[in-house]
């Protein structure tokens, strides 16, 4: 009996040792996998670093590219497109106008009434709709008929409300958030699609004529009287409320900027049609490129798999369309290197399935258990992850968003440097200037709705400029500014006004 007990005890000890060995091996294996994930995070942080010195080098590079783009066509990655806008709203405009805004993920229709004073601006009707994905790869006829039918329904809702004192033909501003080479304030040809649109036969077509043709087919007595880039609309809205506004930036699905430039600095345009001495320039800065940009392997993968590879590199690092997919790619890589996220789901492997608004929700999750992070991961096919993994995801969101926001700030500072509002004198006649109050209008869901992006960008801009200069620079957020501003610009173009030199 004693011998049996000894044998059982020995066997139990062997089993216990075996179990302990397995558990130790599993823990060691788990630690190795976690170390790999931590290593990937560290690599990401290092690749996304944007120290102040690098940002200031980018500011210089942007200012140089701006100058090159003003000298000759094709002389820069920045197109620096003329808009033929040399007068901006000042509050004296009157009348009722419409605007239709085609953005990267939505379109808006608005009706604006102006009574001759800033305080009398009345936005009477607003409709906002998501753009059906099918339209983004359809034909020009389908796209513009859709827009025309939407505008027709909008006007039919008015009934007899349209003022009899207005001309019979309604005036429409078409806000168009894609690169266009303007030939006048009311016409321009499409250069290329961005933000996921791919309607091939549209390149080189006059955008205003396309919309006008669709309106005419439906018997609508509406004249497309202005073709306006969304940034120019935002600048118009900003200037209407604050004459110190000299630039506008959109951070939404994509990103772009415009600003007021002296006409004598626009060397590629020998005879600009302006008497004001200034013209709004549409930068199309999404295509900016510099060796100083902190590009990662995830950016390279995203670019290679996009419909416009080797194009719009800057926009793909700061645009709302792309931030979510960069975060997704990081999580996917970690899933491939480790099992901390469980089995790799087909959902997580799908490009653009993670939207930037979800990144914002995870990044700003203030619940004790990071429940929003857990919910969104579950939607991606990742369930029951421990707290440390949820915190890891928040950190990934932080790294990607912080980089984007700081690069965005460098873009704004580059504009300020070019126009001599960064304290250095820029390309202006005198390096010694008294700092003037400078307003930059900012629009777009990424800036308006993503608090951490906004805070990181504002902080970086202050760091780049320094406190002495930053106190003179005001970044003003505005909602629907590009749509309303386009209607204001249309009203302004109906009267004889000029904008001050910058």
Swiss-Prot record:
Catalytic activity, reaction form: a D-hexose + ATP = a D-hexose 6-phosphate + ADP + H(+); D-fructose + ATP = D-fructose 6-phosphate + ADP + H(+); D-glucose + ATP = D-glucose 6-phosphate + ADP + H(+)
Compartment list: Mitochondrion outer membrane
Biological role: Fructose and glucose phosphorylating enzyme. May be involved in the phosphorylation of glucose during the export from mitochondrion to cytosol.
Family, similarity comment: Belongs to the hexokinase family.
Keywords recorded for this protein, A-Z: ATP-binding, Glycolysis, Kinase, Membrane, Mitochondrion, Mitochondrion outer membrane, Nucleotide-binding, Transferase, Transmembrane, Transmembrane helix
Positions of region (Hexokinase large subdomain): 229-480
Binding residues for D-glucose: 194-195, 229-230, 256, 284, 315
Protein name stated in the entry: Hexokinase-4
Membrane topology: Single-pass membrane protein
Transmembrane regions: 4-24
PROSITE patterns noted in UniProt: HEXOKINASE_2
GO cellular component: mitochondrial outer membrane; mitochondrion
Binding site for ADP: 104-105, 253, 445
Organism whose genome encodes this protein: Arabidopsis thaliana (Mouse-ear cress)
Pfam families for this protein: Hexokinase_1, Hexokinase_2
GO biological process, one term: hexose metabolic process
Pathway participation: Carbohydrate metabolism; hexose metabolism; Carbohydrate degradation; glycolysis; D-glyceraldehyde 3-phosphate and glycerone phosphate from D-glucose: step 1/4
Positions of disulphide bridges: none
UniProt domain Hexokinase: residue ranges: 35-491
């Amino acid at each position: 009996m004693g011998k049996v007990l000894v044998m059982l005890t020995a066997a139990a000890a062997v089993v216990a040792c075996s179990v302990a060995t397995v558990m130790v091996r599993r823990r060691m294996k788990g630690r190795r996998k976690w170390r790999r994930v931590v290593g990937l995070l560290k690599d990401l942080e290092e690749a996304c670093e944007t120290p102040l010195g690098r940002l200031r080098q980018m500011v210089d590079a942007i200012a140089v590219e701006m100058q090159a783009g003003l000298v000759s066509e094709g002389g820069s990655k920045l197109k620096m497109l003329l808009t033929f806008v040399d007068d901006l709203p000042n509050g004296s405009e009157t009348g009722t106008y419409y605007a239709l805004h085609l953005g990267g993920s939505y379109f808006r229709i608005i009706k604006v009434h102006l009574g001759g004073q800033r305080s009398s601006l009345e936005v009477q009707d607003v409709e906002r709709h998501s753009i059906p994905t099918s339209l983004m790869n359809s034909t020009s006829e389908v796209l513009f008929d859709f827009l025309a039918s939407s505008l027709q329904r909008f006007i039919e809702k008015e009934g007899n409300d349209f003022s009899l004192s207005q001309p019979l033909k309604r005036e429409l501003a078409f806000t168009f958030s894609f690169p266009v080479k303007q030939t006048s304030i009311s016409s321009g040809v499409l250069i290329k699609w961005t933000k996921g649109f791919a309607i091939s036969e549209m390149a080189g077509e006059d955008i205003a004529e396309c919309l006008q043709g669709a309106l005419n087919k439906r018997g609508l007595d509406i004249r497309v009287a202005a073709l306006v880039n969304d940034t120019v609309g935002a600048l118009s809205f900003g200037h209407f409320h604050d004459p110190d506004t000299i630039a506008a930036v959109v951070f939404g699905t994509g990103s772009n900027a415009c600003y007021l430039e002296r006409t004598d600095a626009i060397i590629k345009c020998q005879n600009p049609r302006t008497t004001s001495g200034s013209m709004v320039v549409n930068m199309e800065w999404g295509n900016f490129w510099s060796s100083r940009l902190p590009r990662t392997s995830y950016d390279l993968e995203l670019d290679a798999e996009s419909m416009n590879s080797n194009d719009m590199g800057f926009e793909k690092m700061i645009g709302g369309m792309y931030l979510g997919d960069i975060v997704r790619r990081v999580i996917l890589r970690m899933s491939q290197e480790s099992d901390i996220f469980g089995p790799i789901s087909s959902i997580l492997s799908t490009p653009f399935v993670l939207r930037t608004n979800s990144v914002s929700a995870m990044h700003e999750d203030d619940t004790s258990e990071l429940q929003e992070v857990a919910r969104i991961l579950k939607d991606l096919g990742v369930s029951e992850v421990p707290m440390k993994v949820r915190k890891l995801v928040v950190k990934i969101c932080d790294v990607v968003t912080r980089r984007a926001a700081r690069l965005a700030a460098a873009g704004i500072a580059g504009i300020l440097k070019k126009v001599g509002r960064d304290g250095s004198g820029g390309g202006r006649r005198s390096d010694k200037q008294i700092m003037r109050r400078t307003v930059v209008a900012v629009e777009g869901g990424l800036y308006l709705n993503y608090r951490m992006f906004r805070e990181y960008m504002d902080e970086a801009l202050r760091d780049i400029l320094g406190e002495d200069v930053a106190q003179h620079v005001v970044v003003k957020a505005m909602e629907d500014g590009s749509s309303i501003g386009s209607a204001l610009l249309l009203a302004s173009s109906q009267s004889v006004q000029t904008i001050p030199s910058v």
